[in-house]
Amino acid sequence: CKAVKANAGFGIPTVKPWDAGTIAEKMALVRATGAFAVAMDIDAAGLPFLKNLNPPAGSKTVEELRGIIADAKVPFIIKGVMTARGAQKAVEAGASAIVISNHGGRVLDQVPATAEVLPEIAEAVNGRCKILVDGGIRTGVDVFKALALGADAVLIARPFVNAIYGAGAQGVQVYVDKL
């Protein structure tokens, strides 16, 4: 949240699926940043300690999500959707967008690739919210394929991290030019 606030709300803070009280605290922090949207992971994948909290963090019901989304007061993005049923529940809860994500394939390596589930999810959503997708997007061709399969936009992280660590701003520019 500090980085988003320091950049006049440019950025989308992402919260974990904590208990209701912690989420309310996090939403207050998000509102203070001036962020134009907020995201929440729909699961605690890769963070097993979250499930050991009392009360445990993790999956939320449609009703719980409705309350969280209403409290956010900015467009709300649900990340980690991997099924048509999950996408329909996100829409029912009032999400502005979903992110089809298997958390980079390194945390949930037993689940399908995002490109495999994207067409079915796009059909289920049927334009009722924006569909973002991540996971394995590395080239302009990958971006094109994701858009052709039903995504409204793609998210790319690891290649940008590698580019900035390898060559700073110039590395990022080279990567963008190659896209």
Model-derived regions: residue spans:
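N-terminal capping/small domains of soluble enzymes
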Residues: 1-19
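Alpha/beta enzyme core
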Residues: 7, 18-133, 140-164
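Internal helix-turn-beta structural module
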Residues: 152, 166-179
